[in-house]
């Protein structure tokens, strides 16, 4: 995480960035609050119980609160994205 209440006292939101190498995927997570992200490089998909949704560089993503999701890099270059939450730290998150 780049911006949290620890790095910017008084902040009400948080900001971070992630890099996913080709062929990698996160585990399924669900956040207590919504998440927004912007894809700076690469291509991949958000995987949910409803199925995959592809994304590529230049696209913005919105993940509603409580939605189980994973991020997968389906391309041949790193996926780089910035993400944010309306929470002063990384929000309460469940994993499965």
Residues of each region from the PLM?
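Hydrophobic/aromatic beta-strand elements that line small-molecule binding cavities or substrate pockets
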Residues: 16-18, 59, 69
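A generic "binding-loop/recognition-motif" signal
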Residues: 32, 51, 67-68, 77
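A short glycine-rich, His/Asp/Glu-containing loop-to-beta-strand
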Residues: 1-28, 84-86
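Double-stranded beta-helix
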Residues: 10-14, 70-96
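Short beta-strand His + acidic residue motifs that chelate non-heme Fe in jelly-roll/DSBH
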Residues: 26-28, 46-47, 63, 69-75
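Short, conserved beta-strand element in jelly-roll/cupin
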Residues: 17-22, 30-46
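Short acidic-glycine-tyrosine-enriched beta hairpin
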Residues: 50-65
């Amino acid at each position: 995480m780049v911006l949290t209440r620890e790095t910017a006292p008084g902040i009400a939101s948080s900001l971070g960035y992630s890099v996913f190498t080709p062929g990698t995927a996160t585990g399924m997570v669900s956040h207590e609050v919504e998440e927004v992200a912007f894809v700076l490089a690469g291509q991949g998909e958000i995987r949910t119980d409803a199925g995959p949704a592809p994304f590529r560089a230049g696209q913005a993503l919105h993940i509603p609160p409580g939605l189980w999701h994973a991020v997968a890099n389906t391309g041949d270059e790193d996926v780089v994205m910035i993400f944010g939450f309306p929470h002063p730290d990384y929000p309460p998150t469940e994993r499965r």
